[in-house]
Amino acid sequence: MTDKKRRQRGSRTHGGGTHKNRRGAGNRGGRGRAGRKKHEQHNYEDVGKSGFKRPEKTDRDVAVLSVQELDEDIPVLSESGVAEETEFGYRVDARDVVDDGWDADVVKVLGGGQLYEQLEVTADAFSDAAVELIEGEGGDAVVSERASEDDEE
């Protein structure tokens, strides 16, 4: 065992120079983290937790869709089979309309703009303005079963 600790046995100062050299905090550059901005000691990491971590159950991926977007896209959605034409208007599932709608935790329909078609829209959530617009045109805002199951948990 020829490590430094073993080699220093019998030495009064263990390589620290004279017996006066290791006295006090001044020889060590201060106590604790003193002098960390002035001395050439880099990469001090701030230790400990900081900031706010949001609870995971409240951190949801929400995809949004406005009523006006739905209204403008109805002809295209009807042609592609996403919107189903019924006797009163159109039936649409918002998850099929939104990009990555099936990957999102929640698909919410927001009010905004104008609505000229009667729509039966199925989504996880609706803003009050969206419900007002949809039902104002004689349509129906249906909260999906998937959203109801999530609320029960």
Curated annotation (Swiss-Prot):
UniProt-listed SUPFAM superfamilies: Ribosomal proteins L15p and L18e
Entry keyword annotation includes RNA-binding: yes
Lyase in keyword set: no
Stored Gene3D superfamilies: 3.100.10.10, 4.10.990.10
One GO MF term: structural constituent of ribosome
Database matches in PROSITE patterns: RIBOSOMAL_L15 (PS00475)
One matching Pfam family: Ribosomal_L27A
Disordered as annotated region, ranges: 1-60
Keyword terms, alphabetized: Ribonucleoprotein, Ribosomal protein, RNA-binding, rRNA-binding
GO cellular component: cytosolic large ribosomal subunit
Family: Belongs to the universal ribosomal protein uL15 family.
Record's subunit section: Part of the 50S ribosomal subunit.
Function per UniProt: Binds to the 23S rRNA.
PANTHER family, alphabetized: 60S RIBOSOMAL PROTEIN L27A, LARGE RIBOSOMAL SUBUNIT PROTEIN UL15
Protein name (record): Large ribosomal subunit protein uL15
Protein encoded by which gene: rpl15
